[in-house]
Curated annotation (Swiss-Prot):
Fe cation 2 binds at C124, C127, C161, C164. Pathway: Cofactor biosynthesis; NAD(+) biosynthesis; quinolinate from L-kynurenine: step 3/3. Its cofactor is Fe(2+). Binds 2 Fe(2+) ions per subunit. It catalyses: 3-hydroxyanthranilate + O2 = (2Z,4Z)-2-amino-3-carboxymuconate 6-semialdehyde. GO terms for molecular function: 3-hydroxyanthranilate 3,4-dioxygenase activity; ferrous iron binding. Catalyzes the oxidative ring opening of 3-hydroxyanthranilate to 2-amino-3-carboxymuconate semialdehyde, which spontaneously cyclizes to quinolinate. Belongs to the 3-HAO family. Substrate binds at E56, R98, E109. This is 3-hydroxyanthranilate 3,4-dioxygenase. Fe cation 1 binds at H50, E56, H94. CDD domains: cupin_HAO.
Length: 189
């Protein structure tokens, strides 16, 4: 008899709902596979930008999210609405923002090639300069990220912008940094 079996994804989400909100916010469905399949719940906001050496696939199952992206040195918002999918190429700096309570997204990414490092970057809210960058061999999003964030939040020197001297706020973004447009038609322009 085969040990392989399908399962009801919605039932799995319902059973893990308590983990899909702060402070945990996300759960990997399978461990020790060549794919990181992660379910992420909102509300969840962060101030870092991820430099991922591999592609990421986003599917927004419930609610809306904003993926802040840095392209050509400029930050802009990419709205991923309920039911939308998005494919992010490697090394595009991005910061997933899920301000809606109860929102749920699925993020799938391949295992990193041997020795490939992920990086996490924080930018100055005043001058847009790079404040701090940390590189890591990422094995588990759920286990590996919290210590990286905590180290940055607690280190005032790491949070001081080398360009203008502004102190990065750490965990909490400035008010208004993340907004979901009221008029969803504005997304299409």
């Amino acid at each position: 008899m085969s040990k392989l079996a399908a399962f009801n994804f919605q039932q799995w989400i319902d059973e893990h709902q308590h983990l899909l909100k702060p402070p945990v916010g996300n759960v990997q469905i399978w461990e020790n596979t060549d794919m990181m399949v992660t379910v992420v719940g909102g509300p969840n906001q962060r101030t870092d930008f991820h430099d991922d050496p591999v592609e990421e696939f986003f599917y927004q199952l419930k609610g809306d999210m904003v993926l802040k992206i840095i392209e050509e040195g400029k930050c802009h918002d990419l709205f991923i609405r309920e039911g939308d999918i998005f494919f992010l190429p490697p090394h595009v700096r991005h910061s997933p923002q899920r301000p809606m309570p109860g929102s749920i997204g699925l993020v799938i990414e391949p295992k990193r090639p041997e020795g490939a490092k992920d990086a996490f970057e924080w930018y100055c809210f005043k001058c847009d300069g790079l404040v701090h960058r940390v590189e890591v061999l990422l094995k588990s999003i759920v286990r590996d990220l919290p210590p990286i964030y905590q180290a940055f939040y607690q280190d005032e020197q790491a949070r001081t912008c080398p360009q203008c001297g502004e102190l990065h706020p750490g965990k909490e973004p400035p008010q208004g940094w993340v907004t979901l447009l009221e008029n969803k038609e504005q997304d299409k322009s």
